[in-house]
Structures are given as structure tokens and as C-alpha cells.
Amino acid sequence: MIDSSRRAAAKAARRGRPNALFLVAAAETLPSELSGIAGGVTVNFPWGSLLRGVLAQDMPILEGLGRLLGPNGRLEAMVSAVARDGLTLPGDSDLRAGYLAAGLDLSEYRQANAQEIAERPTSWARRLGAGRDRPVWRIVAVARAERQHPEGS
């Protein structure tokens, strides 16, 4: 198991960008040292609690993602949720209000086009049938410059 982890890390290191940080942690409990360090956060086809957070239906998660961003940093998400997922897509005003409460200005919330979906060729998107069997929504938000990152959050 350790050997396969080393091989996976080596492959990622060869492909990764030198300024990329990879972390396995819950979005709502990210270390405070990460507050404000990111110019951008990308979330591709989340499910479960991360999907609820991106849809502003689990605010601690959305707030955690927002805390990662420096002033004017961008959160970009591609999401797909249908009734059988047990989630309802929020209306524009509800999503906007949730993002504002998390210190983010919602700049885009619309159905993604085929090219945007193709630019995110994840295995999970293929399994979902994203864009083919299920609609995909693009969400883009920008961190408000006047936000403060409280100590320990």
C-alpha cells in the first residue's frame, strides 16, 4: 500500500504544477494556516457534503472553501444535481445570498455548455453522464476583498 502511494505521488509530482497544494481534509475544518492562500479553488462534480456546500446548503463547507481564497480569489465549480440525488438546485437569489454570507460574490450561475463540460474530463463526470444524461451547472464566485479571516478559522 505504501509503495503504491509513493508511485501515485511520483506520477502526480511529474504532472503537477510547482505551486499546487494537494490536501486531503474536510472543507469545513481546514487548517487556519491555509486561510487566504489561494488565488483559485476549483471543484469538479462534487457529491455528498461538498456538493451541498457548493450549493450553499451546508454553510460551514462553503465558508471553509471561501476561507482558502485570498482577496479577489476565484471559486469555480461544475455541479450536477438532480431530484434523485436528494438535492434541489437553489434559485439564483438563494445561491447569491448564501455565497454573500460566506464572503463571496457570485458572478456566474448558469447551465454549462458542452465545451465547458469537455474541459473537465473527470472520471466522475463520465460516470454521472454529465452534460449527456444530467445537466451541469457552472458556478463562479469571487472572494470579497474586504473579508477578514478570523484567527483559528
Roles of regions detected by a PLM:
Residues 55-74:
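A short glycine-rich, Lys/Arg-flanked "PGG" loop and its adjoining helix->strand segment in the class I
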Residues 38-58:
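A short SAM/SAH-binding and catalytic strip from SAM-dependent methyltransferases
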Residues 85-153:
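Class I S-adenosyl-L-methionine
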